[in-house]
């Protein structure tokens, strides 16, 4: 049995998730691959697998229940957070993981190939790249935990949005000032997240364009 199976199972249950043993196994395979590749390629600053479990896996899982359905784009996915976690837990959802860092995308492509995952692709490009905007099309949900600035994330997401698209931004503190600047154009729902074993403030912001 994987040394972190019980911890992941308990953590996911604390988040109100009922993940199958198969999905838990996939999540742990992902973490094992991340730990292995991280030794050579520096994919994440977090090196301790136990800390990775909390700050990457459980943190990403904490938004799962609140995400709307539909095709998903994860902008600045890095090593795959939260996009790969979502894809592994929701095989019926089509996911695109986007990052400009070649090493991180190589890792994700290799993992996708090794596990023969059908619902997720990793793309190396800059979010503002015109060709990528044309090729990838539009998405129902756009996630990120990479952007320091909410305004920057919204601007990056715009070309990939339908009128009904939900922007799902993972944040620590609530960026009240930035939300004020967006309030004429976007409705915003703020959801407080309780990540097991993480003593930090975490929030999910769900933004949707206000229809004129």
Swiss-Prot record:
The keyword Methyltransferase applies. Its EC number is 2.1.1.170. It is found in: Cytoplasm. One of its GO terms (molecular function) is rRNA (guanine-N7-)-methyltransferase activity. SUPFAM superfamilies: S-adenosyl-L-methionine-dependent methyltransferases. Its main location: cytoplasm. Keywords: Cytoplasm, Methyltransferase, rRNA processing, S-adenosyl-L-methionine, Transferase. Disulfide bonds: none annotated. InterPro entries: rRNA_ssu_MeTfrase_G, SAM-dependent_MTases_sf. It catalyses: guanosine(527) in 16S rRNA + S-adenosyl-L-methionine = N(7)-methylguanosine(527) in 16S rRNA + S-adenosyl-L-homocysteine. S-adenosyl-L-methionine binds at residues 76, 81, 127-128, 145. GO terms for cellular component: cytosol. Belongs to the methyltransferase superfamily. RNA methyltransferase RsmG family. HAMAP family: 16SrRNA_methyltr_G. PANTHER family: S-ADENOSYL-L-METHIONINE-DEPENDENT METHYLTRANSFERASES SUPERFAMILY PROTEIN. Specifically methylates the N7 position of guanine in position 527 of 16S rRNA. This is Ribosomal RNA small subunit methyltransferase G. It comes from Acinetobacter baylyi (strain ATCC 33305 / BD413 / ADP1). The lineage of its organism: Bacteria, Pseudomonadati, Pseudomonadota, Gammaproteobacteria, Moraxellales. The gene is rsmG.
């Amino acid at each position: 049995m994987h040394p972190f199976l019980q911890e992941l199972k308990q953590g996911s249950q604390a988040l109100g998730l009922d993940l199958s043993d198969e999905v838990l196994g996939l999540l742990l395979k992902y973490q094992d691959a991340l730990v292995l590749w991280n030794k050579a390629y520096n994919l994440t600053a977090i090196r301790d697998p136990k800390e990775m479990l909390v700050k990457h896996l459980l943190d990403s899982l904490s938004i799962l229940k609140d995400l709307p359905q539909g095709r998903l784009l994860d902008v600045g996915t890095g090593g795959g957070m939260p996009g790969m976690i979502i894809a592994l837990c929701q095989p019926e959802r089509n996911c695109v993981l986007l990052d400009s860092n070649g090493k991180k995308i190589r890792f994700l492509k290799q993992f996708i190939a090794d596990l023969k995952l059908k619902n997720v692709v990793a793309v190396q490009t800059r979010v503002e790249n015109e060709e990528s905007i044309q090729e990838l099309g539009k998405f129902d949900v756009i996630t990120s935990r990479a952007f320091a600035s909410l305004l920057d994330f919204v601007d990056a997401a715009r070309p990939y949005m339908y009128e009904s698209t939900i922007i799902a931004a993972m944040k620590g503190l609530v960026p009240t000032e930035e939300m004020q600047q967006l309030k004429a154009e976007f409705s915003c729902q703020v959801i407080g997240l309780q990540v097991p074993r993480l003593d930090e403030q975490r929030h999910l912001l769900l933004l949707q364009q206000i229809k004129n």
